[in-house]
From Swiss-Prot:
HAMAP family: Ribosomal_uS14_1. The keyword Transport does not apply. Gene3D superfamilies: 1.10.287.1480. Keywords: Chloroplast, Plastid, Ribonucleoprotein, Ribosomal protein, RNA-binding, rRNA-binding. Belongs to the universal ribosomal protein uS14 family. The lineage of its organism: Eukaryota, Viridiplantae, Streptophyta, Embryophyta, Tracheophyta. Binds 16S rRNA, required for the assembly of 30S particles. This is Small ribosomal subunit protein uS14c. GO terms for cellular component: chloroplast; ribonucleoprotein complex; ribosome. One of its GO terms (molecular function) is structural constituent of ribosome. It is found in: Plastid, Chloroplast. Part of the 30S ribosomal subunit. It comes from Citrus sinensis.
């Protein structure tokens, strides 16, 4: 189980990313449309002044049961070992174990 502080930090990043999403997207469009390099630098400075944690690359997918940041399956929102345990316990409908 991940520490609660890490999970809360990730939630805070997610809120910041949602808050600044439109601002960042519009700034990037302005950079692409700007005719001169000096205009691009001004817009880039505005983009850099937004909080670091508002960038979408700072987000991690976490297992919603354990909070584990690695080996997550997007379809289920679970980490690999929790997914395996739930499939073995028949708690996920439609998921089957492979055997060969």
């Amino acid at each position: 189980m991940a520490r609660q502080s890490l999970i809360q930090r990730e939630k805070k990043r997610h809120k910041l990313e949602q808050k600044y999403h439109l601002i960042r997207r519009s700034s990037k469009k302005e950079i692409n449309k700007a005719p001169s390099l000096s205009d691009k630098w001004k817009i880039h400075g505005k983009l850099q002044s937004s909080p670091r944690n508002s960038a979408p690359t700072r987000l991690h997918r976490r297992c919603f049961l354990t909070g584990r940041p690695r080996a997550n399956y997007r379809d289920f929102g679970l980490s690999g070992h929790i997914l395996r345990e739930m499939v073995h316990a028949c708690l996920l409908p439609g998921a089957t174990r492979s055997s060969w």
